[in-house]
């Protein structure tokens, strides 16, 4: 029964994260256009920032239970961030001759995601 409950916790978080990613993609396409996958980039950066913060905060705090951590990280962040979409969009750009955009997409997604994990960790240390 415990494993089923944990699966439901992750599933609910995944639903919320994926829904948030969808809303971010709609917002980004409307506001920034469709020439570059800004929605995926924003979702990946936001997810990196939040997972860095949550993981750092949870190491030194009893305020986040193991179930809440599972819900937030594996669930919401797992549904929000998307390596498969990033990969597909990058390959599509490269195979369609948009080499510069493809390379920019790789650099921005990887560079910003790594940077924002560190920023999230530092924010957690500063705030808590």
Curated annotation (Swiss-Prot):
Subcellular location: Cell membrane
Any matching Pfam family: CRCB
Summary of activators and inhibitors of this protein: Na(+) is not transported, but it plays an essential structural role and its presence is essential for fluoride channel function.
GO terms of biological process kind: cellular detoxification of fluoride
Transmembrane segments annotated in the record for this chain: 4-24, 39-59, 71-91, 99-119
Top-level division of the source organism's lineage: Bacteria
Topology class, membrane: Multi-pass membrane protein
GO MF, one example: metal ion binding
Binding site for Na(+): 78, 81
Catalytic activity: fluoride(in) = fluoride(out)
Gene Ontology CC terms, in alphabetical order: plasma membrane
Major place of residence: membrane
Family annotation (InterPro entries): FluC, Multihaem_cyt_sf
Keyword terms, alphabetized: Cell membrane, Ion channel, Ion transport, Membrane, Metal-binding, Sodium, Transmembrane, Transmembrane helix, Transport
HAMAP family assigned to the protein according to its UniProt record, in alphabetical order: FluC (MF_00454)
Recorded family membership: Belongs to the fluoride channel Fluc/FEX (TC 1.A.43) family.
Protein name: Fluoride-specific ion channel FluC
Source organism of the structure: Clostridium perfringens (strain ATCC 13124 / DSM 756 / JCM 1290 / NCIMB 6125 / NCTC 8237 / Type A)
Gene that this polypeptide is encoded by: fluC
């Amino acid at each position: 029964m415990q494993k089923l409950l944990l699966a439901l916790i992750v599933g609910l978080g995944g639903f919320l994260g994926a829904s948030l990613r969808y809303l971010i993609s709609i917002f980004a396409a409307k506001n920034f256009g469709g020439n570059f996958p800004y929605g995926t980039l924003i979702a990946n950066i936001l997810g990196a920032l939040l997972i860095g913060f949550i993981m750092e905060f949870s190491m030194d705090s009893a305020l986040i239970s193991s179930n809440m951590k599972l819900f937030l990280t594996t669930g919401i962040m797992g549904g929000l961030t998307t390596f498969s979409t990033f990969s597909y969009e990058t390959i599509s750009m490269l195979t369609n001759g948009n080499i510069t955009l493809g390379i920019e997409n790789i650099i921005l997604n990887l560079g910003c995601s790594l940077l924002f994990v560190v920023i999230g960790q530092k924010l957690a240390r500063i705030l808590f």
